[in-house]
Curated annotation (Swiss-Prot):
Main location: cytoplasm
Organism the protein comes from: Shewanella amazonensis (strain ATCC BAA-1098 / SB2B)
Enzyme class label: hydrolase
Keywords from the UniProt entry: Cytoplasm, Dipeptidase, Hydrolase, Protease, Serine protease
Family listed: Belongs to the peptidase S51 family.
Signal peptide extent: none
SUPFAM superfamilies, per database record: Class I glutamine amidotransferase-like
Lineage: Bacteria, Pseudomonadati, Pseudomonadota, Gammaproteobacteria, Alteromonadales
Name under which the protein is recorded: Peptidase E
GO BP annotations, alphabetical order: proteolysis
Length: 235
């Protein structure tokens, strides 16, 4: 498979402008891909048209054309016709629900496996894993299944952080992922911090950015992964 998938933890890092830190990661994928389709289904409160314009503005320096999948009469054909696919962040459950609703999971996976570049951030990265069972957001809608694209043979946890507000008594992210690995000890999870990304090119997987990621599987909990590490053994 000639997969080229860039899975960004977030659309921002710190107080930087929207998508600014992602440009060096995305730019190489646009050299031979000028016409992109954007999937805004995770952006509920923002609205699809507003979300599309926000992405166009954030990526304006890349000299590419971006259409919204919601603008096309045939969403599946829009995926086939595009040179590349963007999938934005927001609510992961709603995103996956709509992908099932419009029967898009298979065609996206088919096109990406054939070499079409895929760029997701936040929820758009979540769905690149085996399922959305390690997402952070609220299940506001029930998709037919939690099974996702499977561009990576493990689970993702974008926006990974260990921060806990003083006086807050809820679970930490590590505790939530521990619970997942207790229920499913055979499936790995990689938590990626804001500002970092995973990039798969064929049989090679790399952690991009200057921050550690964290690996969880069975009894292995929060094992650090060095920035820039080769993670190809996970494929």
């Amino acid at each position: 498979m000639n997969i080229r998938a860039l899975l960004l933890s977030a659309s921002r890092v710190g107080d930087t402008p929207y998508l600014e830190h992602t440009l060096p990661f995305i730019a190489p994928l646009t050299e031979h891909a000028r016409n992109w389709v954007f999937i805004p289904y995770a952006g509920i409160s923002l609205g699809y048209d507003v979300y599309l314009e926000k992405v166009r503005e954030g990526l304006r320096n890349l000299n590419i054309n971006i259409s919204g999948i919601h603008e096309h009469a045939d969403p599946r054909q829009a995926i086939r016709d595009a040179d590349g696919i963007f999938v934005g962040g927001g609510n992961t459950f709603h995103l996956l629900h709509e992908l099932y609703r419009y029967d898009l999971l298979f065609v996206i996976r088919e096109q990406v496996e054939a070499g079409k570049p895929y760029v997701g951030w936040s929820a758009g990265s979540n769905i690149a894993g085996l399922s959305i069972r390690t997402t952070n957001d609220m299940p506001i809608i029930e998709p037919p299944s939690f099974t996702a694209l499977g561009l990576l043979p493990f689970q993702l946890n974008p926006h990974y952080t260990d921060y806990q507000a003083p006086g807050h008594n809820g679970e930490t992210r590590a505790q939530r992922l521990l619970e997942f690995t207790m229920v499913d000890p055979l499936t790995p999870v990689v938590g990626i911090q804001e500002g970092s990304a995973l990039y798969r090119q064929g049989d090679k997987l790399t952690l991009l950015g200057d921050k550690e990621a964290y690996f969880f599987k069975g009894s292995v909990q929060k094992s650090p992964i060095a920035a820039g590490a080769d993670l190809s053994e996970l494929l």
